[in-house]
């Protein structure tokens, strides 16, 4: 039996709280102005029309509308279709 704990065991035993990242509103779903669409670390998804970016890279709706996801040249963008809105 060792009297010392060993190098590995003292460095274990931590766990961080989950950050609740990810897509909050999916494609063709309605969102109100100011509603959060995606929480992310870095610009994995780029903002399109009527979508703003927060200081923590959160994408949010500038107007109410339907969420549209598009991928052009390997870049994923999120935009809002404000023409047909029924919220």
Curated annotation (Swiss-Prot):
Belongs to the bacterial ribosomal protein bL27 family. InterPro entries: Ribosomal_bL27 (IPR001684), Ribosomal_bL27_CS (IPR018261). The lineage of its organism: Eukaryota, Haptista, Haptophyta, Prymnesiophyceae, Isochrysidales. HAMAP family: Ribosomal_bL27. This is Large ribosomal subunit protein bL27c. The gene is rpl27. GO terms for cellular component: chloroplast; ribonucleoprotein complex; ribosome. It comes from Emiliania huxleyi. Keywords: Chloroplast, Plastid, Ribonucleoprotein, Ribosomal protein. It is found in: Plastid, Chloroplast. Residues 1-21 are annotated as: Disordered. Its main location: plastid. One of its GO terms (biological process) is translation. SUPFAM superfamilies: Ribosomal L27 protein-like (SSF110324). Disulfide bonds: none annotated. The keyword Chloroplast applies. One of its GO terms (molecular function) is structural constituent of ribosome.
């Amino acid at each position: 039996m060792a009297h010392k704990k060993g190098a590995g065991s003292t460095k274990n035993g931590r766990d961080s709280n989950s950050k609740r990242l990810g897509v909050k509103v999916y494609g063709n779903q309605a969102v109100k102005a100011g509603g959060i669409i995606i929480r992310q670390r870095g610009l994995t998804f780029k903002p399109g029309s009527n979508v703003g970016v927060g200081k923590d890279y959160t994408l949010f709706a500038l107007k109410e509308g339907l969420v549209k996801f598009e991928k052009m040249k390997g870049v994923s963008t999120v935009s809002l279709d404000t023409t047909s809105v029924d919220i």
